[in-house]
Amino acid sequence: MHAVTRPTLREAVARLAPGTGLRDGLERILRGRTGALIVLGHDENVEAICDGGFSLDVRYAATRLRELCKMDGAVVLSTDGSRIVRANVQLVPDPSIPTDESGTRHRSAERAAIQTGYPVISVSHSMNIVTVYVRGERHVLTDSATILSRANQAIATLERYKTRLDEVSRQLSRAEIEDFVTLRDVMTVVQRLELVRRIGLVIDYDVVELGTDGRQLRLQLDELLGGNDTARELIVRDYHANPEPPSTGQINATLDELDALSDGDLLDFTALAKVFGYPTTTEAQDSTLSPRGYRAMAGIPRLQFAHADLLVRAFGTLQGLLAASAGDLQSVDGIGAMWARHVREGLSQLAESTISDQ
């Protein structure tokens, strides 16, 4: 028997976003000033906590949900939300499950969500708010205007972060060509990449909650975040302290460690250096490093990663690659004459454009 994958809070919020049938039903309930208790899933675990009510098994419609919620009991939907399975049922979850909620409806919703693993929605008629519970987490739905205002402020912050990231990335590229990279230069870029990623996650959650109202915001976010994940991976490939180019497992582990850093540690270059395998002293920040060349070669059009990897493993560093002739590059197994010339020209153009940017 296959294990059933339960939805996450993010997935549940996406199902309740503006433009969805469920959101339409919830807004009708709010306008009608009635409360509601809705279970977004049905199986034997849900059936075990249902008492009374009646079975329906009819196609879901926002108007039907609104009418059924006029009764005191809970409404149970099918797992895919396409059908209304039961109505006017009393939910009887395990009372020993801890909850911080005070209202009877909200306590039942939180306990039912924990016990069944399915999202449970509670609509408060007195406070006129909708709360969704998913496996011990809760989220209060917010109107689109409030989310858009918050998200637009975050977009403005992201734009400033992205501008600063572009500046320090160009500075690092110049230092790489001139062979004068310090650990501090690298950690500055790492920090900025992570800051951009984190605020992007915050905005992305808002976009999910906005549903159809967040289309324009999604386009802005995708444009600002384009290439950020690739840049994070490339800087780990270039500067991980491992003597050999890091494996995929090492890269993922390093990125996971960066993800796990607190906001305070993210501002500490020594904490960032530790993640990359370098000494955590302040003095070490001024030590010089030699990039492997992955990041630089990523700027060469049409160059496949497999070819770049072969060249890095053959020449060791970016400076070794810059000093190599087309013939030297062609001597690497797997690199033909055409690719050797292409890489040689690409590296030369990269060096010229980087220096001219000064």
Swiss-Prot record:
InterPro entries cross-referenced by the UniProt entry: DisA (IPR050338), DisA_sf (IPR038331), DNA_integrity_DisA_N_sf (IPR036888), DNA_integrity_scan_DisA_link (IPR018906), DNA_integrity_scan_DisA_N (IPR003390), DNA_integrity_scanning_protein (IPR023763), RuvA_2-like (IPR010994)
Pfam families membership: DAC, DisA-linker
pH influence on activity: Is more active at pH 8.0 rather than at pH 7.0 or pH 6.0.
Cofactor remark from the record: Magnesium. Can also use Mn(2+), and, to a lesser extent, Co(2+). Cannot use Ni(2+), Ca(2+) and Fe(2+).
Phenotype upon changing residue 73 to A: Retains diadenylate cyclase activity
Superkingdom field: Bacteria
A biological process term (GO) from this entry: DNA repair
Residues reported to bind ATP: 73, 91, 104-108
Cofactor needs: Mg(2+); Mn(2+); Co(2+)
Keywords, sorted A to Z: ATP-binding, DNA damage, DNA repair, DNA-binding, Magnesium, Manganese, Nucleotide-binding, Nucleotidyltransferase, Transferase
Catalytic reaction equation(s): 2 ATP = 3',3'-c-di-AMP + 2 diphosphate
GO MF: adenylate cyclase activity; ATP binding; diadenylate cyclase activity; DNA binding
Activity control, per UniProt: Diadenylate cyclase activity is inhibited by the interaction with RadA.
EC number: 2.7.7.85
Function text: Participates in a DNA-damage check-point. DisA forms globular foci that rapidly scan along the chromosomes searching for lesions. Also has diadenylate cyclase activity, catalyzing the condensation of 2 ATP molecules into cyclic di-AMP (c-di-AMP). c-di-AMP likely acts as a signaling molecule that may couple DNA integrity with a cellular process. To a lesser extent, can also use ADP as substrate to produce c-di-AMP. Does not convert GTP to c-di-GMP. Also exhibits residual ATPase and ADPase activities in vitro.
Domain notes: The N-terminal catalytic domain contributes to tetramerization and the C-terminal domain provides additional dimerization. Both domains are required for full catalytic activity. The C-terminal domain may play a role in stabilizing the active conformation.
Subunit comment: Homooctamer. Interacts with RadA.
PANTHER family: DIADENYLATE CYCLASE, DNA INTEGRITY SCANNING PROTEIN DISA
UniProt name for this protein: DNA integrity scanning protein DisA
Source taxonomy: Bacteria, Bacillati, Actinomycetota, Actinomycetes, Mycobacteriales
Gene name per UniProt: disA
